[in-house]
UniProtKB/Swiss-Prot annotation:
GO-annotated cellular components: cytoplasm; Holliday junction resolvase complex
Full protein name: Crossover junction endodeoxyribonuclease RuvC
Subcellular location: Cytoplasm
Subunit structure: Homodimer which binds Holliday junction (HJ) DNA. The HJ becomes 2-fold symmetrical on binding to RuvC with unstacked arms; it has a different conformation from HJ DNA in complex with RuvA. In the full resolvosome a probable DNA-RuvA(4)-RuvB(12)-RuvC(2) complex forms which resolves the HJ.
Active site, UniProt feature: D9, E70, D145
Cofactor: Mg(2+)
Binding residues for Mg(2+) 2: E70
Gene3D superfamilies listed in its UniProt record: Ribonuclease H-like superfamily/Ribonuclease H (3.30.420.10)
Reactions this protein catalyses: Endonucleolytic cleavage at a junction such as a reciprocal single-stranded crossover between two homologous DNA duplexes (Holliday junction)
Length: 170
């Protein structure tokens, strides 16, 4: 039995998503991935509507066991923080309306799970995720958001396995 975990790297212009298949608790394989591209010409409310609609469709089609997002962090520009927070809210709503549990991890936790160090660059995450999952397409410059989404999903898979193993040892 395989479980699907969906990682989402939220954004107000580009939102990367990636689904991994976890088989027998230990084997992780890429399932599907992509980007939701939001037009800068659209009003913010219409971008959020498009994001909600497209992610909701993917959730319905794929039926993941979990959705994984980055925790909110503060940008230098307060407006960017607010807009990203609203995009995260849209994603939380899309998942909760379909009864998919949402898990959140700090960016450095996801980077550590994928690369081995929490302060890894986006390029390092991209390279390592591409190698670990054998997805050469991730190395394209505009696929950083997808690589981050894969890293989030992998982080959750690893931490869930760790929690399961801890339970068996107690």
């Amino acid at each position: 039995m395989a479980d699907l975990i969906m990682g989402i790297d939220p954004g107000t212009l580009v939102c990367g998503y990636a689904l991994i298949k976890v088989e027998n608790r230990y084997h992780i394989h890429p399932h599907s991935f992509g980007k939701v591209k939001l037009s800068q010409k659209l009003a913010l409310a219409h971008r959020y509507k498009q994001l909600f609609t497209e992610i909701s469709t993917i959730l319905q089609q794929e039926s993941p066991k979990a959705v994984v997002l980055e925790t909110q962090y503060v940008h230098k520009n307060p407006q960017s923080t607010i807009k990203l927070g609203m995009a995260r809210g849209v994603l939380l709503l899309a998942a909760s309306l379909q009864d998919v549990p949402v898990f959140e991890y700090a960016p450095n936790t996801a980077k550590k799970a994928a690369v081995g160090k929490g302060n890894a660059s986006k390029k390092q995450v991209q390279l390592m995720v591409s190698k670990l999952l054998r997805v050469p397409d991730l190395l394209a410059e505009d696929n950083e958001d997808i690589a981050d989404a894969f890293a989030l999903a992998m982080c959750h898979a690893h931490l869930a396995l760790y929690q399961d193993l801890k339970k068996t040892l107690v």
